[in-house]
Amino acid sequence: MKKSNNNLTLYKGYINREDRERLHGHKSFVIWFTGLPASGKSTIAHLVEKELYKRGCSTYVLDGDNVRYGLCSDLGFSIEERKENIRRVGELVKLFVDAGIIVITSFISPFKEDREKVRSLFKEEDFIEVYTKCPVETCSLRDQKGIYKKAIKGEIKNFTGISAPYEEPENPEITIFTDIDSPIEACQKILRYIKDKLKL
């Protein structure tokens, strides 16, 4: 999408990210979940948020389906529209992190290039990519929405894992084998990583 920012000026206020982090009592960062549909992204993301909330952290979960009800309601599922979806989400997450909030996202985000563009918006220590790795057969079996069946029948076009590709992350900070680890085990693994890396 073409930018039209020739006459714009980035305004900086009196309060910065560090001020907001002090107010919240912790660092802000993003936990970016990526993986096939029904691989466990949203379930684990909300468990992580629940545990961080118990610890007094200011958090927010951005979920792929929810975002498409509002911010990205004008987008379909073509390759270009999927790329624009992730671009918008990346910019939104950047604002949340600047506000001093821990942002947890749950998006298929199937293309490596798009994930790397989002990563480039942040300092290295502020971006934690979590890959929920799961065989497509297992995802299909646990699919409560019935979307895999529709995709296999051809009723849903450009469905990731069936009729559209998913490019696996090469070096995610965390890989969760969700056909082996339970959601609670996955949540604890992520919390240990956060504690060790960010001294939360």
UniProtKB/Swiss-Prot annotation:
GO annotation terms (biological process): hydrogen sulfide biosynthetic process; sulfate assimilation
InterPro entries to which the protein is assigned, alphabetical: APS_kinase (IPR002891), P-loop_NTPase (IPR027417)
Top-level class of the enzyme under EC nomenclature: transferase
Domain of life assignment: Bacteria
Record keywords: ATP-binding, Kinase, Nucleotide-binding, Phosphoprotein, Transferase
Residues involved in ATP binding: 35-42
PANTHER family, alphabetized: BIFUNCTIONAL 3'-PHOSPHOADENOSINE 5'-PHOSPHOSULFATE SYNTHASE, PAPS SYNTHETASE, ISOFORM D
Name of the protein: Adenylyl-sulfate kinase
Originating organism: Thermodesulfovibrio yellowstonii (strain ATCC 51303 / DSM 11347 / YP87)
Upper taxonomic lineage: Bacteria, Pseudomonadati, Nitrospirota, Thermodesulfovibrionia, Thermodesulfovibrionales
